[in-house]
Amino acid sequence: MAEAKALPRFKKLYNENIRKALLEEFKYDNEMQIPRITKVVLNMGVGEATGDSKKPAVAAEDLGLIAGQKAVITRARNSIATFKLREGMPIGTKVTLRQDRMYEFLDRFITIALPRVRDFRGLNPKSFDGRGNYAMGIKEHIVFPEINYDKVDQIWGMDIIVCTTAKTDDEARALLRAFNFPFRQ
């Protein structure tokens, strides 16, 4: 018999508290209209990849440690002579998180990584795209506890995109606030 997996803390919070609160706040007709987080995309652009082809592999390894699943190396779609970039060259790395891994990552990100960011004053509440998705950037990937600071040869920045089923930014903002995203006032 298979062992029962523990339900991630944020998933439990969403199912037990957040769904009810959003249903009351926005007066949805159907429970399927309640916004939920569908995926989290982590992206690292490696600008120095044109000079050293090993850098994207190192960045992908670090991103894999942060995300808990293997990262994919992204390649250039077209050539840009000014940047010495050729089509098909590795220029970054990304990983898409869904389901339990997504909730576990968000939990670690909000409770552990964000408080470790230097001069952190809160997330920008205007970084929504108009369709209920939220994007943010981090200047240093070493804020995550999975990264061993002594073994890091270069500090990378990264983008974190939270995709939701919310129709408007206000619904998405209410959803992320319920997950304790620390937005600036």
From Swiss-Prot:
UniProt entry keywords in alphabetical sequence: Ribonucleoprotein, Ribosomal protein, RNA-binding, rRNA-binding, tRNA-binding
KW Coiled coil (keyword) present: no
Entry superkingdom: Bacteria
Pfam family name, one: Ribosomal_L5
Cellular component GO terms, alphabetical: ribonucleoprotein complex; ribosome
GO biological process, alphabetically ordered: translation
GO molecular function: rRNA binding; structural constituent of ribosome; tRNA binding
Keyword Ribonucleoprotein part of the UniProt annotation: yes
Oligomer and partners: Part of the 50S ribosomal subunit; part of the 5S rRNA/L5/L18/L25 subcomplex. Contacts the 5S rRNA and the P site tRNA. Forms a bridge to the 30S subunit in the 70S ribosome.
Biological function: This is one of the proteins that bind and probably mediate the attachment of the 5S RNA into the large ribosomal subunit, where it forms part of the central protuberance. In the 70S ribosome it contacts protein S13 of the 30S subunit (bridge B1b), connecting the 2 subunits; this bridge is implicated in subunit movement. Contacts the P site tRNA; the 5S rRNA and some of its associated proteins might help stabilize positioning of ribosome-bound tRNAs.
NCBIfam families registered for this protein in UniProt: PRK00010.1
Annotated family: Belongs to the universal ribosomal protein uL5 family.
Protein name: Large ribosomal subunit protein uL5
Underlying gene: rplE
